[in-house]
């Protein structure tokens, strides 16, 4: 039983791996961990909207293993919010979520924009002088002045709080580089 959706499920991003586990998200908003030896799901969480990026994986000095990922609006129509998340890779528990600054709009049918809103590519896990940051490129964000562009957000890895942001002059669907 359940509802039939009017789109096909697919995996747009790539797979991250740690040990025997593979992590990936799909167009329906399900992020899951699969044991590559048994091909059985270890955990799965519903993020409420499409995942089009490859999750970024980081192992921390304390032994924790974490995924950083985000969603894109419009494919499922179940959510009106772009989500940026840190997830415990071993349990599937959400460590933090940042939504406050992002007001994205879905505009794929808009001939001028021709673009999804949200996280379209993997975030950058900061190293060296920026090892406390995770950096997301979020496409098609509506700013306070109602203009729409991509925005690069740097978040504190520990808390998910925004450290800085930089609006871009155009849409952008690429991973940030450091």
Spans of model-derived segments:
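Extracytoplasmic/lumenal domain signature
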Residues: 1-178
């Amino acid at each position: 039983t359940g509802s039939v959706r009017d789109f096909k499920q697919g995996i747009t991003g790539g797979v991250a791996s740690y040990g025997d586990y593979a992590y990936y998200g799909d167009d329906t908003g399900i992020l899951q961990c699969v044991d590559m030896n048994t091909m059985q799901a270890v955990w799965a969480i519903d993020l409420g909207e499409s995942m089009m990026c490859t999750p970024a994986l980081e192992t921390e000095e304390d032994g924790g293993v974490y995924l950083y990922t985000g969603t894109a609006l419009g494919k499922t129509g179940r959510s009106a919010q772009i989500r940026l998340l840190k997830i415990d890779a071993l349990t599937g528990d959400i460590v933090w979520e940042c939504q406050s600054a992002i007001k994205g709009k879905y505009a794929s049918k808009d001939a001028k924009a021709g673009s999804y809103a949200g996280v379209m590519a993997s975030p950058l896990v900061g190293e060296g002088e920026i090892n406390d940051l995770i950096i997301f490129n979020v496409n098609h964000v509506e700013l306070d002045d109602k203009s729409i562009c991509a925005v690069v957000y740097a978040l504190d890895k520990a808390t998910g709080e925004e450290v800085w942001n930089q609006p871009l002059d155009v849409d952008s669907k690429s991973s940030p580089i450091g």
